[in-house]
């Protein structure tokens, strides 16, 4: 999506709820797709050798490096999957984020890493829904909040506002 800050890839997703062992390969694949997007190019469909009909004569664009991942990740902030997404926690300096990695928009906007309940695991409130933003976009996070009044799902919507 073209924004005032450049083109950004947005992903809406839902990872498996089964086990950490079934989610971790999904997390690793998301990170691989993100890191290799520039080399793989933009998504296209159909026969790209056609006369240019699909592109309406526009030149092929490159894949942007910036991305936002939104959705039900089915893991909690104390999980291995969360650490894989945003980096390890150090006792002195907080999370060590890879320059090509992601930040948790909820935390970057001032939310508590262990807080912000979006769903329940059994009868225990949990944060399973996230907005992960490319490290290169973290300064663009204006706000991130949970719509606690919404009742259209068993999860509460997580909203993200970027500059």
Please provide the spans of the model-predicted regions.
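Active-site regions of metal-assisted phosphoester/phosphodiester hydrolases
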Residues: 1-163
